[in-house]
UniProtKB/Swiss-Prot annotation:
Official protein name in the record: Aldo-keto reductase IolS
Conditions for induction: Induced by inositol. Repressed by glucose. Is cotranscribed with iolR, the repressor of the iol operon.
Chain's role: In vitro, is able to reduce the standard aldo-keto reductase (AKR) substrates DL-glyceraldehyde, D-erythrose and methylglyoxal in the presence of NADPH, albeit with poor efficiency. Shows only trace activity with benzaldehyde and butyraldehyde. Is unable to oxidize myo-inositol with either NADP(+) or NAD(+) as a cosubstrate and also does not use glucose, 2-pyridine carboxyaldehyde, fructose, xylose and succinyl semialdehyde as a substrate. The physiological function of this enzyme is not clear. Does not seem to be necessary for inositol catabolism.
Similarity-based family: Belongs to the aldo/keto reductase family. Aldo/keto reductase 11 subfamily.
Length: 310
């Protein structure tokens, strides 16, 4: 079984993880079935997926609780749990809070919901506007020294915020948006993360299915669908993106897989990226994602895709 090391941490993970926002994330998806979500987590662990990525905001703690229920059925040491916090309830809304007290409290509350003694990777989910980022990370380092967390991550940070957060060299992982249609991170983040041995975990890797070969140039989306608001899905740009994605079909055919496996394998071929955490709602989607780990792209494949989406 392939394993990858996350940044400076001692965490070893299978290169395909599971994003669990559809496990108990009732505030994100309507009509979620909790038993289906729990079965998805079970299937992930049974099939060798070691990393489960969750967050307080996924169902306002419910995702963590459901994962905690499933964890009891397995050896805790076989699973790498990543969770995130930054959302503090204020009236009927949420505000971002990176204050040391709030983050420490969040770690303790996540431990209870997950029904575990330690969290493998704890992220600051979003930056707030006022807390010095090194102070926020130092609070998490106290939790690490206490054995409550094993490694520290930040998510959605700018490069300047990341540098401030990593002032004492304590950040193990950065999670941020990166995909073939938005390669900005290659310029902004990758030189820094590479130099400081910080693992970059991309989210939004298939751009709402656009890079999965699911759509044609004539595909339209219902009124109110979020994809209508995304630049990549608008007008001529959408059609051009579809044409590019279709050019990946021969490579997929050659490797006997589908287009999304080729896209995901291209990310994993980058030295800055150790693991991907595609989401799934059903076990069959998860099993399909796992196939990516068996795809080894040739240098020719990698260069072709690089130029196609330059």
């Amino acid at each position: 079984m392939k394993k990858a090391k996350l940044g400076k941490s001692d965490l070893q993970v299978f290169p395909i993880g599971l994003g669990t926002n559809a496990v108990g994330g009732h505030n994100l998806y309507p009509n979620l079935n909790e038993e289906t979500g729990k079965e998805l987590v079970r299937e992930a662990i049974r099939n060798g997926v070691t990393m489960l990525d969750t967050a307080y905001i996924y169902g306002i703690g419910r995702s963590e609780e459901l994962i905690g229920e499933v964890l009891r059925e397995f050896n805790r040491e076989d699973v790498v749990i990543a969770t995130k916090a930054a959302h503090r309830k204020q009236g009927n809304d949420f505000v971002f809070d990176n204050s040391p007290d709030f983050l420490k409290k969040s770690v303790d509350e996540s431990l209870k919901r997950l029904n575990t003694d330690y969290i493998d990777l704890f992220y600051i989910h979003f930056p707030d506007e006022h807390t010095p980022k090194d102070e926020a990370v130092n609070a998490l380092n106290e939790m690490k020294k206490a054995g409550k967390i094993r490694s520290i991550g930040v998510s959605n940070f700018s490069l300047e915020q990341l540098k401030e957060a990593n002032k004492d060299g304590l950040v193990d992982v950065l999670q941020g948006e990166y995909n073939l249609l938005n390669r900005e991170a290659e310029k902004t983040f990758f030189p820094y993360t590479k130099e400081h041995n910080i693992s970059f975990i991309p989210y939004f890797p298939l751009v709402s299915g656009l890079l999965a070969g699911k759509y044609t140039e004539d595909t339209t989306f219902p009124e109110g669908d979020l994809r209508n608001e995304q630049e990549h899905f608008k007008g001529e740009r959408f059609k051009e993106n579809i044409r590019k994605v279709n050019k990946l079909a021969p490579i997929a055919e050659k490797h006997n897989v589908d287009i999304p496996h080729i896209v995901l394998a291209w990310y994993l071929a980058r030295p800055e990226i150790d693991i991907l955490i595609p989401g799934a709602k059903r076990a069959d989607q998860l099993i399909d994602n796992i196939k990516t780990a068996d795809v080894t792209l040739s240098q020719e494949d990698i260069s072709f895709i690089d130029k196609l989406f330059a």
